[in-house]
Amino acid sequence: MSNTPLPSSFDAHPEFFQETKWQKFTRRIKEEPLIPIGYAATSYALWRAYKSMKAGDSVELNRMFRARIYGHAFTLFAIVAGGIYYGQERRQRKEFEKALQQKQDQEKRDAWLKELEIRDKEDKDWRQRHAAIEMAAKEAEKKRG
């Protein structure tokens, strides 16, 4: 049996590979850069609202609360639009991850079965050796007796 991997429908897609959490994070930011921008805008508006509240500037406070709402709306829009735009790719990635998990599970199962077969063979060999030794002992006893 050769060690070459079986062909896969994911071979044509080099972006499908096992990735670390950091790689996934950077990939997702690259795929949907508007979401972090929305988070940043919302956070900045909240920070400015906090500063305005501490300074007692109610006009700026209300303006920043409105900016926070706009930041939330922008972020929500980016999430929904990105979900629609990248929906098919996410389904493919989930299929790939499921196939990868099944492959890993099958490899574990195959390794376990191989180990059981090796142990079974060792046990049979031991029994055959033991039976041969026992027969040789009986024959030696017959010759002596």
UniProtKB/Swiss-Prot annotation:
The keyword Transmembrane applies. Disulfide bonds: none annotated. The keyword Protein biosynthesis does not apply. It is found in: Mitochondrion membrane. Cytochrome c oxidase subunit which plays a role in assembly of respiratory supercomplexes. It comes from Ajellomyces capsulatus (strain H143) (Darling's disease fungus). The lineage of its organism: Eukaryota, Fungi, Dikarya, Ascomycota, Pezizomycotina. Residues 6-97 form the HIG1 domain. It is a multi-pass membrane protein. This is Respiratory supercomplex factor 1, mitochondrial. InterPro entries: Hypoxia_induced_domain (IPR007667), RCF1 (IPR050355). Signal peptide: none annotated. Belongs to the RCF1 family. One of its GO terms (biological process) is mitochondrial respirasome assembly. Associates with the respiratory chain complex III/complex IV supercomplex. Residues 86-144 form a coiled coil. The gene is RCF1. The chain crosses the membrane at residues 33-50, 69-86. Keywords: Coiled coil, Membrane, Mitochondrion, Transmembrane, Transmembrane helix. One of its GO terms (cellular component) is mitochondrial membrane. PANTHER family: HIG1 DOMAIN FAMILY MEMBER 1A (PTHR12297:SF3), HYPOXIA-INDUCBILE GENE 1 HIG1 -RELATED (PTHR12297).
